[in-house]
Structures are given as C-alpha cells and as structure tokens.
C-alpha cells in the first residue's frame, strides 16, 4: 500500500440547509482547525472498521458572486482528505471517481442555535418559531455558531447541506510528493 488517494471535499457552508439550519461564517472559521485529523466514514457509522479517510487540511473559500438565501456572501468550509489506494478501498475510489459517491455530511457540536425570526438561542429555550415556516415574509431557520467540536464527515446519500461533497481527486504513488496538493 505505497499509494494514497487524495480528494477535496466541501464539508459545509453558510447556506441554509434542508433542515433549515446554517453555519455562521465565524463558525466555519472555528470549525476549520477542528476538522483537521478527523475521519471520513459512511453514513455516520461510529464503528472504527468503517473509517475510510482522514482530513489533513481545511480552508474557507468564498464563492465569488454567490449569496445565501439571507444575503450573505456564500462561504464554504473545504477540506483535503486522503485514504489508502488499496484493494480494500478500490470500489469506493472508483465510485468517487465516477461521481457516484459524492455527497457528504458533517458531524459536529455547536454551542448556539439562534432563530432567524426572534434571535433567541434555541439551546437556551424561549423560541416557539418553526424552522422552515415563514413569519411576515421572513424564512425561519437557525444559525449555528460557537463551534465546540468536530467529530467526522460521512459519505451519505442525501446531505442536509446541498453543496457538500467531493470536488476533486488525485492519486499519488510513493515517488510523488503529497506536498504537491497542499
């Protein structure tokens, strides 16, 4: 197993997702270092035998000319991850290369979840607004902030964040230098 397979992945963004939650831009910046060294698994399985990849770098990328539903510049937390390019991972690598395994979801802990309508922190109570509904023309969603921890990213069929997923991949042999992708 002298070869590794490296791929870029969009972990999450500050866009409102399918669960009517979004990360603040500041929380994306807080999550970036927390995801370095975290594992990539399938379907949020917590079995160590299901670990497939590991994140070795993260960065925030502003999507020029694109904005979130609430008018912020769209920013994505992106990562570089690697896995062994061996027989055990061959089918997963083929599925990634073919665009079949593409979507991902993250697991993390956020200390705050503020309602877009009233501004109250749902983690502290005091908000009866329902995410996904409109109140006086304003969409109700929660803004997640104050990152406490990052646990993993998972390959999933339907991610909460529509744009989360694999964006580019590389294969390296022992003769090539992984620094080239940094």
What annotation goes with each model-predicted range?
Residues 1-181:
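Signature of dsDNA virion morphogenesis modules
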């Amino acid at each position: 197993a002298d070869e590794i397979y490296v791929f870029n992945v969009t972990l999450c963004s500050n866009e409102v997702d399918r669960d009517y939650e979004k990360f603040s831009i500041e929380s994306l910046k807080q999550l970036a270092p927390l995801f370095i060294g975290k594992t990539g698994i399938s379907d949020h399985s917590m079995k160590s035998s299901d670990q497939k990849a590991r994140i070795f770098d993260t960065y925030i990328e502003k999507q020029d000319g694109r904005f979130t539903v609430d008018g912020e510049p769209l920013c994505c937390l992106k990562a570089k991850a690697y896995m062994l390019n061996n027989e055990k991972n061959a089918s997963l690598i083929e599925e990634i290369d073919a665009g079949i395994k593409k979507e991902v979801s993250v697991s993390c802990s956020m200390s705050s979840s503020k309602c877009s309508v009233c501004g109250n922190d749902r983690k502290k109570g005091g908000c009866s607004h329902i995410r996904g509904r409109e109140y006086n023309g304003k969409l109700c969603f929660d803004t997640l902030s104050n990152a406490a921890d990052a646990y993993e990213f998972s390959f999933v069929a339907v991610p909460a964040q529509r744009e989360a997923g694999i964006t580019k991949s590389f294969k390296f042999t022992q003769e090539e230098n992984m620094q080239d992708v940094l």
